[in-house]
Amino acid sequence: MAEYVNYVLGSLYVSDTATSTIPTDVRNFIAPPFPLNFWSGPTFTVSSNTRADPLKLVAARHRAAAAAIDTLEAQSQYGVANVDALIRPLERQVAKVADALAALEDAARAAESADAATPQVNASEADQRPDNIGQSLSEIQIAKNDVPMEFDTNLAVDLLATVFVSRAAGGSNGVVFGTWYRALQDRLVTERPVATRSIDYRDGRMSKTFMTTAVVSLQSCGRLYIGNRPYSAFEAAVLCLHLAHRAVNSNYTYPTSFSGLIEQLPVYIEAFSTALGDGTLGKVGYEFNGARLPKNQFHVPGGGGRYERGALNGHGVLETLIRLKVLPAIPGSLGTTSTAVGPELDADQTAYIDDVNKAAAAFLVRAQNLFLTEDQTLLRSTINTITALLLLRRLLWNGNVYTDRLRNNFQLGAIVPNLAVSQRDARGASGGDAAAMVSRSGNNNFTFLCERYVSPIYIANREVELTQLFPGLAALCLDAQTVARDQPQHRAVNVSTGRNQTNLTRLIGIELENRRRTAPVPINEVLAAHDAVALQYERGLGLLMQKPRLRASLEETRRLGQFNVASDYDLLYFVCLGYIPSLTSAM
């Protein structure tokens, strides 16, 4: 019976329901019990609380939104605190950088004028100055027809500051120094932009900071920075020239002080120049044996006292000093220490007697030995100093400083304030005065320089070297590589100055970078740059001394014109200062 269902018309088999017709009847509706209160539920009837439900929903949503806003605000405040903690140090660093950049901008803008300003001292203040301040100033005179000048520590640097101050008084920076310095500054800006952040080269102007660094770098060409030596190369050179003069002149009254020896340098140089030619059959050489010298290094390697044997051979100045017995033979050139020099080479057995040490004791009295052959770095620098003095004599020979002043690019009256020049001192102010002075000056200008310029500076600074006295001479020697490339029959004028001064540009860049960096450039890099410039200066000395017509060659190739040198008067000031300023009108 479980398989049958009772319907109104009778019983049917369940399996036959697909083909059977079942009449509609309540008894035939197979479904679960239907809810009795279904049609009276809330879906089909309106409740009295219908209006309150949306308000509750809105209130719930409002509370949820308020809670979300509170959470978001708390999170934002926490994030702001964290961001502030991270950004505050960065903001402080950025502020410091901005202040530093602003200070550098102001310094670069004002360095050309305000930083160079020196306080003007009137007559009443000058009378009230302490005695020690007045004594610290050195008085020198370069040209005979100019008044003496006083300076503090460095004439070239002090006068350079005065040049920019005098031009900045009119609210302009129109000062130029020739194409050589222009090319040098442009090359520095291109190759070492970091070093040029502290200089003002806007609108093509020449920077005072750059010019000061360049002049100081030129003055350092002949200085020795490794080792502690009681004597300078300039002092050793003066003593050697004095002894050489004594060797060729028996009847001569000599001074008793070292400053007196300096004033006699023109006489000594004249006699030494004659001795150079007398002892040489062929052409005098002014270069060492470069194959035996250390590469890219001026000092003796390893801190020793001697170069490789034969490294200093071939230089006419050294050979003349040995021939005149001013210097003893170079150690090792006459035999070893175990073998004595034979009588056939040294009859008097005086080959190793050093008169330079005796002269240093007599004139300088420092209780320190001076054996140049034992300190061959100092010997090399001494030979270069004597060669530079010979070159200076040739440059200034027969110079006429009494020509028309309007032909000179250097006008001292436009630079030095309150310059009262009397009629007696203003000779050469017109062409008529120059026509009255047609006689040759010979060595007079060099003699005047030694008496009124070199000697006072040496008295003020006993450690001064020749390149510090004559930075312009060093500039000409550094430029000599350009002159050497000109063939005798080559008529083109070489104006490619910048590419020949890579070493000097590097040294200037290092000096400028050291002024800005908290951690300076390593000392080895500084010494390498200095040695490169010193070696280039040494090669330039040899190249210029080989020129048979030195002045004519420099003028024909416009090597003097690139330094603003237009006359003998300009050349005299150029070798002493290292530059010739020209004041230009503002554009």
Swiss-Prot record:
Keywords carried by this UniProt record: Capsid protein, Host nucleus, Host-virus interaction, Viral genome packaging, Viral penetration into host nucleus, Viral release from host cell, Virion, Virus entry into host cell
Cellular component GO terms held in the UniProt record: host cell; host cell nucleus; viral capsid
Chain intervals for the UniProt region annotation (Disordered): 113-132
Gene name per UniProt: CVC2
Family: Belongs to the herpesviridae CVC2 protein family.
InterPro entries registered for this protein in UniProt: Herpes_UL25
Gene Ontology biological process terms in this record: symbiont entry into host cell; viral genome packaging; viral penetration into host nucleus
Chain residue ranges for the region called Interaction with major capsid protein/MCP: 1-53
Oligomer status and interactors: Heterodimerizes with CVC1. Interacts with major capsid protein/MCP and triplex capsid protein 1/TRX1 at the pentamer vertices. Interacts with the large tegument protein/LTP.
Species of origin: Equine herpesvirus 1 (strain Ab4p)
Spans through the membrane: none
Name the UniProt record assigns to this protein: Capsid vertex component 2
UniProt keyword annotation of S-adenosyl-L-methionine present: no
